[in-house]
Regions:
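Short, acidic/polar
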Residues: 46-62, 165-176, 266-279, 331-344
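Active-site-adjacent "subsite" loops/lids of carbohydrate-active enzymes
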Residues: 31-40, 48, 119-120, 125-179, ...
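Catalytic domains of carbohydrate-active enzymes, especially glycoside hydrolases
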Residues: 52-79, 179-184, 277-284, 348-352
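Polysaccharide-binding and catalytic clefts of secreted carbohydrate-active enzymes
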Residues: 145-280, 289-295
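Substrate-binding cleft of secreted/luminal carbohydrate-active enzymes
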Residues: 281-371
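Sec-dependent signal peptide cleavage junction
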Residues: 15-30
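Aromatic-lined substrate-binding rim segments of carbohydrate-active enzymes
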Residues: 56, 74-126, 226-252, 301
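Boundary/entry segment of secreted carbohydrate-active catalytic domains
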Residues: 27-53, 60, 260-262, 327
Length: 371
């Protein structure tokens, strides 16, 4: 979820359909219990056996965790190639070492015994498995005056505008909703890495049909009318995909909770505008890693600016759950201040979420500052 720190964000350009207004989905209650603490966990680094799941859930219960966001589809190209899954899928390839170990099934069984909810965390277009299936669907960017496949740091991304890719990704979401008693499905990697993508031929043609000019003629390094038009179009395509995914999943399981992890709204180069897809989800999780981007703590809780201000302004009537790194020993007082100010300035926020990239140990649970 967070490795984009080294190359900021990822791709996402979705359906070429025009975004049509639909009635907003009634917001579901995330929880009736105030001030809950949730965690997000990567599967490859945490779960190799059933015993690993049981021990993890015991720790989560001990440290009063209300929700576990489980990585059911690999998010990065590291221990496992991106896009490989950790459940019994007939759609996506199962990760090596997990063909006889259904992590999602095991987690639901153990967590529900402890009254802990399980949300399936499903990254979308950072997907080497999909690229292997559809080799012509790789994301394209601009280098000099040439369009080239985007393969930053050995990472693999597919073009979200590709119809086959869209259908494939949504079929995974539907499979999870149909086969498993998950309490929610949460999407990630719904974004671009920069203004210069996607620039595949099909995307360029679709935008040119709408605007009258080829996007490769845009000066991407400056803030200008054409770049703003391009970015507005990209954000609308992303919203159109979320709309399609939401409707498809809810046709499978009507009342399932749906959400999206987002980058700070001020990162406009990522082509992600929660204001355009808020009506199709119940929860938004803004990634509030203030230290990673050299912001002060007030950037999180500011009453007139900052990530929560921007998110609430765009996503009115949508539940907001800010996501944080675990605090270091020198950050604990800062986190206490952040939470106190957040409760004052944003009283509707009732939950926070913690994420770490590696393995959750008891020493990590002990670092939790409760909301």
């Amino acid at each position: 979820m967070k490795k984009w720190m080294t190359f900021l964000c990822i791709l996402l350009l979705c359906s070429s359909q025009t975004l049509l207004p639909v009635s907003a989905t009634p917001a579901k209650s995330v929880s009736s219990t105030p001030r809950q603490t949730q965690i997000t966990v990567r599967t490859a680094t945490n779960f190799k056996t059933e015993s690993d799941v049981k021990k993890f859930v015991q720790l989560a219960s001990k440290y009063k965790i209300s929700v576990i966001y489980l990585n059911v589809k690999q998010d990065e190209d590291d221990e496992v190639p991106s896009g490989y899954v950790y459940y019994k899928s007939k759609v996506a390839p199962i990760a090596k070492g997990y063909r006889n170990f259904d992590v999602l099934k095991s987690m639901i069984k153990e967590a529900h015994k402890k009254s802990i909810k399980v949300y399936a965390w499903v990254p979308q277009f950072h997907d080497r498995a999909a690229l292997k299936k559809y080799p012509n669907a790789q994301m394209k960017t601009l280098v000099g005056k040439k369009t080239v496949a985007y393969n930053q740091n050995g990472e693999y991304f597919v073009n979200p505008l590709n119809k086959k890719i869209q259908k494939y990704e949504i079929s995974i979401l539907k499979e999870i909703a149909k086969k498993y008693d998950v309490d929610g499905i949460f999407l990630d990697w719904l974004r671009f890495d920069d203004y210069k993508m996607d620039l595949s031929k099909s995307t360029r043609n679709a935008f040119k049909k709408k605007s009258g000019y080829d996007p490769i003629t845009i000066s991407f390094s400056t803030n200008n009318a054409k770049r703003r038009q391009w970015n507005s179009w990209r954000t609308s395509q992303l919203a159109s995909y979320v709309k399609q995914a939401s409707r498809s999943v809810r046709q499978t399981k009507k009342d399932i909770l749906l959400g999206v992890f987002i980058l700070p709204p001020e990162f406009t180069e990522c082509g992600q505008d929660v204001g355009k897809f808020k009506s199709y989800i119940d929860v938004v999780l803004p990634m509030s890693y203030y230290k990673d981007w050299d912001f002060t703590p007030s950037w999180v809780y500011g009453k007139n600016s900052g990530i929560l201000y921007d998110t609430q302004k765009k996503a009115k009537n949508t539940s907001i759950i800010p996501t944080f790194d675990l605090p270091s020993s020198t950050q604990k007082d800062s986190y206490k201040t952040i939470f106190k100010k957040t409760q004052k300035n944003y009283p509707k926020i009732k939950c926070i979420n913690y994420f770490i990239y590696g393995k959750w140990k008891e020493s990590h649970f002990k670092k939790i500052v409760y909301y």
